[in-house]
């Protein structure tokens, strides 16, 4: 099959008519060299590389980028260069194994760093590499096993009904064979530019990583008196993230951020000026009016965001209840009908048999139970039984929510669902008698397993849809996904420990916003102090009101919770996306520029994140440049703004090259 002839059928993205069948790009009647030394080696390499990059970026800014598109571009680039015969078939497997990186990373870094964060307060708490590795691995395996019975429902039965934005983009890259080879060049150049830019800041500190209105006396005055401050992170990777997220989603995230920073924070200083609000946290001894905007945000604003995220997760389950029922009944029918159906299935409809899935699920849950019993609960049978029941039920219920979210908007509200899991796990574990630091570690490991399972389910449904469009054998994707999970779990465990040793999660140099939220939620619950339920309730009410007005509540709540300096760059990137894709009167030119922008943004993200890992490795090895006193100077922030403007100008000029 020649690369040039590879095109998607015209019914790939629309609903099928009565009696119409979807014929994938690769014929179901032919056998292709999908799994071989080439595809497995590159897949494992991509899983390692992007796990390290995604873990660094996720812990630094709280956003995990989906690696599917950059991996697909690299796969197409290397297979074109090597003139591979069955390049398309191999590339789907490379992408499928490699894409485990983002899924496992999101699961691990949203929860497990909370153990390190709480360690500063409770030195007796500890997390070994094995605990991080095993919880990530088991969570990933559970996610894969729980999703396979729903493959046919999401991928085939709902064909054309769900947009699958990320799967669509990745499929287009894989299909564009020749074009994909040329796409690798701008991606690599952008990776070098973004990587060098972020490396200079992280390693040498030539300019500050943030620009704030505190750089001048007037701004400092406004921050202290009116509690109003503006901040923006000037990094290349976060800017690229904003471009890919797009203006609409970035705008809603920033609205949430500004609602907290410019309405709630100054509002609280005005209303409760001379009061010490420490009902939830006895360590707070300062009156609200005497706090800095940052302190008010940390003590009160974030909790409102947490309430919003949790409620958005509940709303997600309610909305998805019909899907859960349909998918479960379909899976049950498949299981019952499997034995009597002696027909050999067509290659593109072949899954791992339901018998194997059922046995695999039982074994995995049994191993998870043993891990909880001996590795986490120190031999307490009751705690281990309660823990495994909670994890299995929550992971199963939320699996379809995660897959549905990815199918519709391409983003997985995993942090909100995990936050709910943690609150539920903490309340239940305290009720059965597990409290204190042991309870915290247990609940966080449980949260880590659930979070990785949900993250994996969402990511995997993307892979399976790509395979469906292109004609891959689902069984091969499903089987080799386990290897990618193993590699990614080992990599993320190593990177997390490296970053903790280098920077320390409690230092403030790693935002790790989700893990900080988990730590903030779990600490009071496990110590009997009680949580700031009133603040959670305010956030929950905001989420309900937003849902009524059809505003994406999760995006808004995430903005309320993630620090402002990491939200504003998303808006900058989103605005540049809008600018680049609307400049020309010719729609085709706009579309081409937008796609070129996606490539450059992907390069910024991958390059910036990978060089961030290199910078952390250098620091770990003792190569440290002291730039703290320089960063305290307003000039470093002004220079930061100049560098940022130059980066944006470069980005816009680079997209213009697509004529």
Task: List the model feature ranges, each with a label.
Residues 1-659:
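Alpha-helical multipass membrane-protein architecture
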């Amino acid at each position: 099959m020649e690369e040039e002839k590879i095109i998607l059928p015209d019914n790939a993205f629309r609903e099928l008519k009565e009696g119409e069948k979807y014929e994938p790009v690769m014929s179901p009647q032919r056998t292709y060299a999908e799994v071989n030394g080439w595809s497995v080696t590159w897949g494992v390499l991509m899983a390692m590389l992007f796990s390290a990059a995604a873990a660094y970026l996720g812990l630094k800014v709280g956003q995990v980028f989906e690696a599917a598109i950059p991996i697909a571009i690299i796969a197409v680039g290397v297979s074109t260069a090597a003139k591979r015969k069955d390049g398309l078939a191999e590339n789907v497997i490379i992408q499928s194994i490699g894409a485990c990186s983002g899924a496992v990373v999101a699961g691990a870094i949203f929860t497990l760093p909370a153990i390190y964060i709480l360690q500063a307060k409770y030195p007796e708490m500890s997390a070994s590499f094995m605990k991080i590795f095993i919880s990530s691995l088991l969570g990933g395996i559970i996610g894969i096993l729980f999703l396979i019975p729903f493959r046919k429902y999401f991928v085939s039965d709902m064909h054309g009904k769900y947009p699958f934005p990320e799967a669509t983009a990745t499929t287009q890259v894989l299909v564009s064979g020749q074009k994909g080879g040329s796409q690798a060049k701008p991606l690599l150049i952008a990776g070098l530019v973004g990587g060098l830019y972020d490396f200079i800041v992280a390693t040498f500190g030539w300019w500050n990583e943030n620009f704030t209105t505190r750089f001048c006396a007037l701004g400092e005055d406004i921050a202290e008196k009116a509690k109003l401050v503006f901040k923006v992170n000037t990094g290349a990777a976060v800017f690229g993230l904003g471009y890919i997220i797009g203006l609409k989603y970035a705008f809603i995230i920033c609205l949430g951020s500004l609602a907290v920073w410019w309405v709630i924070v100054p509002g609280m200083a005005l209303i409760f000026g001379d009061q010490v609000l420490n009902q939830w946290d006895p360590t707070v001894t300062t009156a609200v009016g005497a706090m800095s905007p940052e302190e008010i945000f940390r003590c009160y604003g974030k909790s409102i965001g947490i309430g919003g995220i949790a409620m958005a997760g509940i709303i997600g389950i309610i909305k998805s209840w019909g899907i859960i029922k349909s998918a479960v009944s379909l899976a049950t029918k498949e299981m019952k009908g499997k034995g009597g159906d002696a027909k050999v299935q067509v290659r593109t409809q072949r899954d791992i048999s339901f018998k194997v899935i059922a046995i695999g699920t039982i074994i995995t849950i049994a191993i998870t139970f043993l891990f909880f019993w001996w590795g986490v609960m120190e031999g307490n049978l009751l705690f281990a039984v309660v823990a495994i029941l909670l994890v299995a039920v929550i992971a199963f219920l939320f699996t379809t929510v995660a897959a549905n979210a990815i199918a519709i908007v391409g983003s997985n509200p995993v942090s909100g669902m995990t936050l709910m899991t943690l609150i539920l796990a903490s309340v239940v574990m305290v009720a059965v008698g597990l409290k204190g630091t042991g309870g915290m570690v247990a609940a966080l490991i449980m949260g880590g397993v659930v979070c990785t399972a949900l993250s994996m389910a969402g990511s995997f449904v993307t892979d399976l849809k790509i395979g469906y469009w292109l004609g891959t054998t689902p069984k091969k994707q499903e089987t080799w996904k386990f290897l990618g999970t193993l590699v990614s779990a080992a990599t993320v465990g190593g990177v997390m420990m490296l970053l903790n040793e280098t920077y320390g999660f409690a230092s403030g140099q790693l935002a790790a916003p989700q893990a900080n939220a988990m730590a903030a939620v779990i600490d009071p619950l496990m110590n009997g102090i009680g949580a700031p339920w009133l603040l959670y309730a305010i956030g929950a009410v905001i989420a309900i009101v937003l849902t009524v007005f059809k505003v994406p509540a999760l995006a808004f709540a995430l903005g309320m919770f993630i620090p402002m300096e990491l939200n504003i760059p998303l808006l900058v990137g989103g605005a540049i996306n809008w600018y680049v894709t609307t400049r020309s009167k010719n729609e085709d030119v706009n579309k081409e520029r937008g796609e070129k922008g996606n490539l450059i943004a992907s390069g910024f993200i991958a390059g910036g994140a990978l060089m961030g890992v290199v910078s952390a490795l250098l620091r770990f090895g003792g190569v440290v440049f002291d730039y703290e006193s320089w960063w305290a100077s307003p000039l470093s922030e002004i220079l930061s703004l100049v560098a940022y403007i130059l980066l944006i100008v470069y980005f816009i000029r680079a997209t213009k090259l697509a004529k």
